[in-house]
Each structure stands twice: as structure tokens, then as C-alpha cells.
Amino acid sequence: MKEYQIHLELDRSQQHNFLYPLLFREYIYALAHDHGLNRSTIPLENGGYDNKSSSLSVKRLISRTYQRIHLSIYAKDSNPNHFIGHNNKFYSQMISEGFSVIVEIPFSLRLVAFLEGKEKEMAKSHNFQSIHSIFPFFENNFSHLHYVLDVLIPYPIRPEILVRTFRYWVKDASSFHLLRFFLHEYFNLNSLITPKKSNSIFSTSNPRFFLFLYNSHVYEYESIFFFLRNQSSHLRSTSSGPLFERISFYGKVEDLVQVFVNDFQDYLWLFKHPIMHYVRYQGKSVLASKDMPLLMNKWKYYLVNLWQWHFHVWSQPGRIHINHLYKDYIDFLGYLSRGRLNTLVVRSQMLENAFLIDNAMKQFETTVPIIPLIGSLTTARFCNSLGHPISKPTWADSSDSYIIDRFMRICRNLSHYHSGSSKKKSLYRIKYILRVSCVKSLVRKHKSTVRVFLKRLGSEFLEEFFTEEEHVLSLIFPRALFTSRRLYRGRVWYFDIICINDLVNHDKLEIVPN
């Protein structure tokens, strides 16, 4: 126990006193506790505002709100439940954005200092910033493994869980009053803390604020997970990034261990294994190990208890799956991945005796999930539920070049993102739907027929949807046309993709152009 206490002993000076007492003084307590705020009738324009809200503008806004509260009390407002007219969203968003900017300052400075020490290592691995770099990691490290723990990280149901998580990083009490005010307001009005979709927390009216809170929640979860993982492994990781700037860590881990057994060392030996890999993107994580299903079940039991007892979140049964890598698919980052055994028969002959030797070659296969992609196209009104292309009536007022450019952009980004697929047939199906939908949209605009329109436009238009990616590869390999065609049919991983394709998220289809 003393050994682990030494590892977990951190400097309490890393706790931060944020700038709220200096900037806002008593206004924070007024916002958090003064119910007169709900009786305010402040007229405010609905005009746009700068997303980069400064702390000065937020301070002025809070001062105006505080003054108007007293004016409304003296005026004896006849409608006490009227909340800042129809501009409640504007006030909350302005203040919460200023809150996000300020709380990010100490974490950003700490992160920059940490990255400066890793500058030489990062210069050698700058390509690893791409999402596609995860799949070569799968190919190199997962091909000899057998079991995968597919995990969906649950979100905190109660706002107080987020506030408590935030308290481990700071000691400024006024910050918690303001944070609690925003969380309860958003939770009561919009239920943003328990989103129906896994990624709807990122598409709220203030994504920066909730993104910061969500990352704090995941960081809290992974810091405990990585500590126990490193202590239980024979090959311990040398990275200390997930553990910097934590307080009261030892007591939390000790309480967590008491849920399982009384002896910390007896608990850790249950998970000792030399080969284990962990990968996460947003709210989905993958934990892979070799042929030890008992070990994976114990890690599943550990994660469920961690969420239930430490984060007070009830984990649904469908959030953790134990899959066999060579029998089940892993749905990760818009790809369906699994291991595959290819048998290679070799004929060997010694003198008069001939032998047939079967060699099993292990490969990692990645394919495009056709059904979710068709579901996204159906939601975006490019096809029906059966996958039959339909026209896009909302673009009928646009020019022909604009409509064609929109469809081409979607196809180009889709081909670019799914270029690592082992089988291109599903990708061709999606591009066919978009191609026919583009034609039908133009036909509907010109009130013509498909045959007449294609005859006037020519067949070159249709070929562009299929030759765009091959043209890009021919520019990369100008002297080897055969090489570019072979790469186009095979798997290609790009190192310039820094965010997941919106089509994969199944929420929206439009992609930001490069």
C-alpha cells in the first residue's frame, strides 16, 4: 500500500484558484442562489455575438443582469415566472462561454508544458494525429489477440456528478456555484446531461462548455483505469500524461478497491497480463487481450462497478460486449473490423514423398457498414429506407453547378474517409445512391426525364463519381498508373484526417470542405 501511495502522491499546489472572485465578486452567488433572477424582464437584442467571448464582456453581462434584477423587484413585475423574455438562451450561453474560456486557461498552460517535454517524440510521430493511424495500430497489435472488450462509456445522469468531478481539479468554491447553476438550468430545461444519442452532447447550443465537462468526466474515468492497468501489467507504461494535475487520488483508489477486496495487492494480481491494448475515441473504447476470456470478464466486472460506485451511473447491459476478434465485428470509427485467418496451402516434396502444408495467415479486415450509411442517407433524404435513390427537393432552387458540387464533395470525402476498406463493394453502392440522387435532383429542377437529361449531359458526368479517388492517387504516383489503380482497389490510410466523418455519426451528412 505504501508503494502505491508514493506513486499517487501529488502536489496539492496544482489546485487552481480561478479568476471568478476577482472578476465577478458576489455576482456568482447571486446567480447561483438569488431566485430573483427568474423574475427579470430584460429586453435584449437577438443579434449575433462573437463566439470568442472575453471575460470582460461576461463580467459586464453579469453586472447588467444583477442590476436589472433589482429594478424588476422594485417595479413589482406582474409575471414572476418570466425568464429574461425570449433571450434566456443568449444570457446563459454568453456566461457559460466565458466560464469555458477561463477554466481552460490553467489546463491549457499545464498541457503546453507537458507537450514541450515531449516535443522531440511528437515530431517523430506527427502522423499519428490522424484518425486513420488507429487502424494500422489495430493491424500491427490486434492480429495476434483473440478477445475484445467493446465499451460505451456512460454519461453522468446527475449534474452533481460533473460538479464533484470538477472539484478534484480546483479549490475555488465560487466556480462550483456558477457551474452548478449552469448544469441544473440546462438539465431542467433541455435535459442535455442525459442525451438520447451518444454524440448529442457535442451538438448543444454551447458545445465548448459541454465538451470541456465531458472531457473532464472521461479524464476522471481513464485516470483511475490507467493507474490500475499500469500497476497490474508486467509491461508497465512509461507515460504519465493521464495522471498529471490530480488531487485526492490515493483516497479515491483506496475506496474503489474496498468494493472488491480488502487487500489491494490481491486485487491487482487478478488482472496481470503482459499483452493488453486500449483505444478510445470520444465515448467508445476498445480493450483487447489474448486468449483469456476470464480476464476480460473480470475487467468487465471492474468497469461496471467503477461506474456504479464511483460515478453513480447505472451501466446498461448493452454497453459492454465481449467479442471474439475472429468471429465478431468491432464497430469503431465508422468501420467494421475483425481478424481473419487466410489459409495458404504449400506443397513440399522430399525425395519421393510430397507434403501439403497449411499455413494460417492472420490479417485484420476493415469493411464499410452499409446499413448505417444507408440509414444516414435516408435521414438526409438522399434515398428511402430500402436504399432507392430519391431527389433532393431542398436544393431545387440552387444552380446546377452548386448541386453537382455538393454531391461531388460528399462522394469525395466519403471515399477519402473509407479508403481503408478491404471491400469496396459497399462503398460503390453508397456512391451509386448519391450519383442517382444527384441526377434525379437535377431532373426535378429542370422538369425533365432521367434519359433526356443524361443524354444531354453525357456519360462523363457519371464517371466523375467513381474516378475522383483514382485521379487523386494518380497525382501521388504519376509514373505508375498501375500502382495507383492497385492502391485504389486496396486499402489506403491517410494521415490528414483529424475528425470523424459526419456521415459515420449518423446525424448529419454535410461535410466541411477541405
Curated annotation (Swiss-Prot):
Transmembrane segments: none
GO biological process: mRNA processing; RNA splicing; tRNA processing
Pfam families recorded: Intron_maturas2, MatK_N
GO cellular component: chloroplast
Listed result of changing residue 367 to I: In strain: Isolate 24/2 AMO 02
Main location: plastid
An MF annotation (GO) of this entry: RNA binding
Keyword Ribosomal protein part of the UniProt annotation: no
Keyword match RNA-binding: yes
Known outcome of mutating residue 467 to M: In strain: Isolate 24/2 AMO 02
Localization (cell): Plastid, Chloroplast
Purpose: Usually encoded in the trnK tRNA gene intron. Probably assists in splicing its own and other chloroplast group II introns.
Family designation: Belongs to the intron maturase 2 family. MatK subfamily.
Listed name of the protein: Maturase K
Protein species of origin: Acer monspessulanum
Chain's gene name: matK
